[in-house]
Curated annotation (Swiss-Prot):
Record keyword Coiled coil present: no
Membrane-traversing stretches: none
GO biological processes: defense response to bacterium; regulation of DNA-templated transcription
Name of protein: Probable transcription factor At5g28040
A Gene Ontology term for the protein's cellular component: cytoplasm
Modified residues annotated as Phosphoserine in this record: 14
Sequence ranges of Acidic residues compositional bias: 33-62
Length: 427
């Protein structure tokens, strides 16, 4: 019974098995196929991509990206060296990497080639002014202060002068540079004047320095404080003896310029040969605001090699308008006038002629005789008594005139001395 039952079951299932497997051998093969339907065997390349990259499409992958390079497996060989395997097509030669990619190199290049702009403070110390520019600047400033002369309360301003001189000079400069240049030229002039006052013998080193000093003397011998380049730390030479009275006007103002054994210019009474010191005078004396002109020694004939330490020109200004300097100047002019020298020469010649000869030879005496005396001396040698008498009388008359003139000069000197002694603020 049992065997029949198994046969019945087998026969009932056999048609299905025959349809599916197609025989006994096919039935086993069909069983394997049915059990393997849910198993997917990946391809070798797909398995590798699934393990490392979720995106299987290599089209969107950057070949030079660090992720692609770090993705390559590294193996260590037996020799101790490390071999890095790169994916196909992702290796980039080192030479092809641009040098501009280094940001540090960019910064260094910019620092080397970048030049900071030059500010005004650095331009002040550069050589902007040539010798011709200095002369033109001083001449223009002299004309400006002559036309715009200010007093103690309203001195001339340098702002209009800057606008005026800017169009005349062929260079670019600002007002600060102009003020600095004028201040340096003023200090340069004061250094020369300080050497005069100390009695030192100095000489100009170039014609340009001579011309600069001449123009500067005309500017700063007559001006006090000027707006725009005041330098109150260093006073002018003519400002050292300034005295203010109670009313605020200038009192007894004396200016002395002296030097020993130097050549003197008869036009302005100052030395023509001086030297400019490289050191700058920085003496702190005081402060002055008013105009103080300096009187030259005199406008008369002055011999060369005059010792100005002994022959001093003194200018005195009284509060009531009288100018003592003019009086002294006229007195000195009378003392050293050509007529006085002619009188002295004539007197010397007459004394020598009266003795009957010329000591040491006639050439020495003839050198000091005036042309007016020569005809008389020739007549005296010729033995003509009438001519000698006429010349003698003429000389007596001339000497009397000179004597009276000397008396007038002495009276003026005495009156000046008495005036100085009786002045209330003369001390």
């Amino acid at each position: 019974m049992a065997s029949d039952q198994r046969d019945t079951d087998f026969s009932a299932e056999s048609p299905d098995l025959e349809e599916d497997g197609g025989g006994g051998g096919g039935g086993r093969g069909g069983g394997e196929t049915e059990s393997d339907e849910d198993v997917v065997i990946p391809e070798p390349n797909e398995a590798e991509d699934d393990d490392h990259d979720p995106d299987p499409d290599p089209e969107y992958e950057d070949l030079n990206s660090p992720s692609m390079i770090s993705r390559a497996p590294a193996t260590k060989s037996s020799s101790g060296t490390v071999t890095v395997a790169l994916p196909a097509g992702s290796a980039v030669p080192v030479a092809s990497i641009p040098s501009d990619s280094d940001q540090k190199w960019h910064r260094m290049t910019e620092i080397v080639h970048q030049r900071p702009p030059i500010d005004d403070s650095r331009r002040l110390f550069q050589r902007l002014w040539t010798d011709e520019d200095e002369i033109e600047l001083l001449r223009g400033f002299l004309d400006y202060i002559t036309n715009h002369r200010g007093n103690s309360s309203h001195p001339p301003d340098t702002a209009p002068f800057y606008e005026q001189i800017k169009s005349k000079l062929q260079l670019e400069f600002n007002k600060n540079q102009l003020v600095e240049k004028l201040r340096r030229l003023k200090k340069k002039y004061r250094n020369v004047m300080s050497k005069f006052s100390s009695g030192k013998e100095v000489f100009f080193k170039s014609p340009h320095d001579q011309a600069t000093f001449d123009i500067s003397r005309k500017i700063w011998n007559q001006t006090g404080k000027i707006i725009g380049f005041e330098d109150n730390n260093v006073m002018d030479l003519e400002e050292t003896n300034h005295v203010n009275n109670a009313n605020g006007s200038s009192g007894f103002n004396v200016s002395v310029i002296g030097n020993a054994n130097v050549d003197v210019d008869s036009e302005n009474g100052l030395e023509k040969k001086v030297t400019i010191s490289r050191k700058r005078s920085r003496s702190r004396i005081g402060k002055i605001d008013e105009d103080k002109p300096v009187l030259a020694p005199c406008d008369g004939v002055i011999p060369n090699a005059v010792n100005l330490n002994e022959n001093v020109a003194v200018g005195c200004d009284f509060g009531d308008g009288r100018n003592l300097g003019v009086l002294i100047e006229e007195t000195v002019k009378n003392c050293v006038s050509p007529m006085i020298k002619e009188m002295m020469n004539s007197t010397t010649g007459m004394m020598m002629a009266a003795t009957g000869g010329f000591p040491g030879g006639g050439a020495h005496a003839l050198g000091v005789l005036s042309p007016m005396l020569m005809p008389s001396m020739n007549l005296g040698f010729g033995g003509k008594g009438v001519g000698d008498e006429r010349w003698r009388r003429q000389q007596i008359l001339e000497l009397e005139v000179y004597s009276r003139r000397l008396e007038l000069v002495q009276e003026q000197i005495r009156a000046t001395v008495n005036e100085l002694k009786t002045m209330p603020n003369g001390g």
